[in-house]
Amino acid sequence: MHVHTTRGSTDSGLSPADLVSVANELNLDGVCITEHGGSWSDAELQEVADGTGLALFSGREIETEVGHVLAIGLPRYEAGLHRFSALTEFASGNGVALVFAHPFRHHTDPPAGQSCLLTAGLSEPVPELRMNAEALAKAIPELSQVHAIEAANGATSQADNELAAATASVLGASTTGGSDAHSAHGIGSGLTRIEGRPRTSAELAEAIRVGATEAVAGRPDEKS
């Protein structure tokens, strides 16, 4: 549900061909490519999948003032979508699904010089909110303005992922998982279980919008 390739993410070393190859080795049913820049058409995705049976979907990871948001099924990028309010308004009118990506990365145990973008601006003393999912859900209204919360991110600590899952539970929000892979090494380290069998980016977006997803941590042992 969350991976980057060399086609649209300058910080990625993962080619689309290698992505498809590794995903098939892992018996994944599908992969959603969420580039930092640019997007894929369904026709381009089908060409890359090249008859392997792997379903490929397109989205975009957008950095907003409150954190990173995955916009699944984004038909085009427009100026101003880096503002969270503009992004939610655009999504509402265009059938786009929004997923808060790794919302609490660097929150529970931040590395030196880094902080969680989502919680850094809270006026409440950080110790009171450190691991309190109910307080965080109440203090951050943006978490209830997306369709799902990423609760199993392969590039985020277990503690931060667990806090995301707990907060989603408080909000009654559905969850997703994604590797956030920028190389072949991380593919499959965060997964999403989806009700039904979406085959296009629009169908995947609709599944997320109606809450038909669930985060699954770890690589798969078999197709699911």
List the predicted regions and their residue ranges.
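Flexible loop residues that form catalytic
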Residues: H36, P103-F104, G154
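Divalent metal-dependent hydrolysis catalytic cores, especially in the metallo-beta-lactamase
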Residues: V20-W40, V96-V99
